[in-house]
């Protein structure tokens, strides 16, 4: 499946707040469409609940269905809670780290910065948004828009990262924990969704 390029606020109205997808806040808190306001009346099936949790993760981090399934399979092979390992792998992607450092307004914008070669990791230009950042790696950019956004960023940088806003330089201090992930999602439902695949 290709990258999603459609209306983003429509997705936020259906799934809830997705900070990595868009910074816009919808005016209406019900799904778009003719039956949007009354859609909250119907009982959601267990499948739909799990599907919506999975879609939240997909749209927030901008990964395809195939990529997400690959992350789930990799998390299953690792030791530890599968759901937390899945979130940790997604959060340690280079585009997600660039976004969380405050260098970009969304993960989508961070992905574009990375793929255009505007971000370096330990002094080397990395153009792969899915690159897994490790502890101790230094992420830096000299691009004017990134430096400007880093200086004016008013959000909170998670404690597993450290940032120098004036130089647009950040460092991965330690692995991310579940409490530091800025997305409200039930990872156990996502693992259950993929349990048959």
From Swiss-Prot:
InterPro entries per UniProt: Ribosomal_uS4 (IPR022801), Ribosomal_uS4_bac-type (IPR005709), Ribosomal_uS4_N (IPR001912), S4_RNA-bd (IPR002942), S4_RNA-bd_sf (IPR036986)
Cytoplasm among keywords: no
Residue ranges occupied by any S4 RNA-binding domain in the UniProt entry: 92-153
One Pfam family linked to the record: Ribosomal_S4
Keyword Nucleotide-binding: no
Subcellular location, record wording: Plastid, Chloroplast
GO CC term (a single one): small ribosomal subunit
Superkingdom: Eukaryota
GO biological process: ribosomal small subunit biogenesis; translation
Keywords on record: Chloroplast, Plastid, Ribonucleoprotein, Ribosomal protein, RNA-binding, rRNA-binding
Location, primary (coarse class): plastid
PROSITE patterns: S4
GO molecular-function term, one example from the UniProt record: rRNA binding
Classification via PANTHER family: 30S 40S RIBOSOMAL PROTEIN (PTHR11831), SMALL RIBOSOMAL SUBUNIT PROTEIN US4M (PTHR11831:SF4)
Function: One of the primary rRNA binding proteins, it binds directly to 16S rRNA where it nucleates assembly of the body of the 30S subunit.
Protein family per UniProt: Belongs to the universal ribosomal protein uS4 family.
Known partners and oligomeric status: Part of the 30S ribosomal subunit. Contacts protein S5. The interaction surface between S4 and S5 is involved in control of translational fidelity.
UniProt name for this protein: Small ribosomal subunit protein uS4c
Species of provenance: Ostreococcus tauri
Source taxonomy: Eukaryota, Viridiplantae, Chlorophyta, Mamiellophyceae, Mamiellales
